[in-house]
């Protein structure tokens, strides 16, 4: 990761998204509103003001999602965190003068369960307190790295299945070859069924390749659904657009790169495009591009 220092400045424009009136019984259909700023009063806990009403939000102590919006120019658009927020209320909030103010843990003390989006492998934020912007940065950075590790693990699993098929075929040569000819199988007596054994090994290799392809296709499908789900949850709010526009002007030269060079080529049977490229970081709104590999570095188009 590089240029993460700029994220401290950019987080001054970050927003939080919480349900405005609780969570409906049917779960994900909960209404959301966008909060334009974190507010703070001297001697009082940090509170959140509604960008629609100007009033302070009251969050029921229910299981809900919090969205930390990071400027799109950094390649990390939004990080959804499963959370269990406490009920809070501050009747007279004042606009914050600078994000250098500490975020009071009374507001974000109960970020629990679920982890960052991609619940299957990004389950790292369990009971964590964010008391400063630096901790938010660390959490985002760790999530990006964990996501890269998870993708790498999937590719290694596919690669391992293919390698097992190769090892099995090579084992046939090792067991039955008793001379130095270039193709020892041709010199074996087929009366012992050696050719049948070899053919069986080739069939098993083909089966391993097929299974690997199916596993990769299933994983890619899951990732595509995850991106679609996130796209549906991101709100097209004017205040959010203003935040993104302002942040781009401040950090237009910034970049956050994380590349995982773990590509495999299965000899034409399955080609993952040379590897997994996270491009500009963790761009959860990006398209799933199988022509050039699994590219999660796109930006959500607002």
UniProtKB/Swiss-Prot annotation:
Bias type Acidic residues, positions: 223-257
Tissue occurrence: Component of the acid-insoluble organic matrix of calcified layers of the shell (at protein level).
Signal peptide start and end residues: 1-22
Subcellular localization(s) per the UniProt record: Secreted
Region described as Disordered: spans on this chain: 221-257
Lineage: superkingdom: Eukaryota
Glycosylation sites: 242
Coiled coil feature spans: 198-234
Keywords, sorted A to Z: Coiled coil, Glycoprotein, Secreted, Signal
GO annotation, cellular component aspect: extracellular region
Protein name: Coiled-coil domain-containing protein 2
Upper taxonomic lineage: Eukaryota, Metazoa, Spiralia, Lophotrochozoa, Mollusca
């Amino acid at each position: 990761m590089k240029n993460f220092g700029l994220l401290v400045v950019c987080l001054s424009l970050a927003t939080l998204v919480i349900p405005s009136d609780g969570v409906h019984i049917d779960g994900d259909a909960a209404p959301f509103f966008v909060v334009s700023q974190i507010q703070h009063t001297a001697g009082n806990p940090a509170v959140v003001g509604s960008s629609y009403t100007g009033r302070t939000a009251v969050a029921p102590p229910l299981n809900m999602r919090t969205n930390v919006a990071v400027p799109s120019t950094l390649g990390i658009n939004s990080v959804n965190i499963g959370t269990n927020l406490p009920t809070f209320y501050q009747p007279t909030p004042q606009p914050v003068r600078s994000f250098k103010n500490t975020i009071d843990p009374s507001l974000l003390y109960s970020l629990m369960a679920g982890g960052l989006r991609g619940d299957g492998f990004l389950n790292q934020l369990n009971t964590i307190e964010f008391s400063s912007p630096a901790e938010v940065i660390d959490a985002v950075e760790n999530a990006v790295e964990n996501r890269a590790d998870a993708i790498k693990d999937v590719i290694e699993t596919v690669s391992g299945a293919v390698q097992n098929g190769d090892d099995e075929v090579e084992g046939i040569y090792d067991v039955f070859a008793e001379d130095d000819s270039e193709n020892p199988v041709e010199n074996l007596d087929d009366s012992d069924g050696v050719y049948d054994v070899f053919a069986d090994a080739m069939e098993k290799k083909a089966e391993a390749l097929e299974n690997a392809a199916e596993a990769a296709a299933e994983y890619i499908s899951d990732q595509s659904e995850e991106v679609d789900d996130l796209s549906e949850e991101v709100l097209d709010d004017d205040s959010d657009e203003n935040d993104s526009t302002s942040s781009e002007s401040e950090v237009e030269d910034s970049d956050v790169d994380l590349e995982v060079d773990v590509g495999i080529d299965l000899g034409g049977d399955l080609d993952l495009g040379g590897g997994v490229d996270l491009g500009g970081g963790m761009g959860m709104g990006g398209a799933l591009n199988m022509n050039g590999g699994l590219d999660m570095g796109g930006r959500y188009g607002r």
